[in-house]
């Protein structure tokens, strides 16, 4: 009985050590992958089209606002036959960003009061 108990403790210790080593390897791989994704995102962010600028050359190139990506909206100006496309923020997303900003400010006040 003592041998079985000792053998069980040895197996649990060996398993926990090996799983900790594997988790460290996975964490390192995830960290390297995350760094490469951040570098790609920074490179891509420099090429975005600002709000109210022409986006007809690439309709998916609009810049991000604080929370959401702007949308390339196309329309025909009054009295014109040519289609005009510009990066714009839809109104519902504008209101959602304002609400999120107010919630952040309110959360900061609560943290200040009780923190």
UniProtKB/Swiss-Prot annotation:
Give the protein name, as stated in the record.
U3-lycotoxin-Ls1g
Does the keyword Signal belong to this entry?
A: yes
* Record's keyword terms, sorted: Disulfide bond, Knottin, Secreted, Signal, Toxin
Spell out the GO cellular component terms annotated for this protein, sorted alphabetically and separated by semicolons: extracellular region
Q: What is its main location?
A: secreted
Location of the protein in the cell? Secreted
Write down the Pfam families for this protein, in alphabetical order. Answer: Toxin_35 (PF10530)
Q: Which cysteines are joined by disulfide bonds?
A: 48-63, 55-72, 62-87, 74-85
Q: Where is the secretion signal located? A: 1-20
Domains: what does the record tell us?
The presence of a 'disulfide through disulfide knot' structurally defines this protein as a knottin.
Citing just one GO molecular function, the answer is:
toxin activity
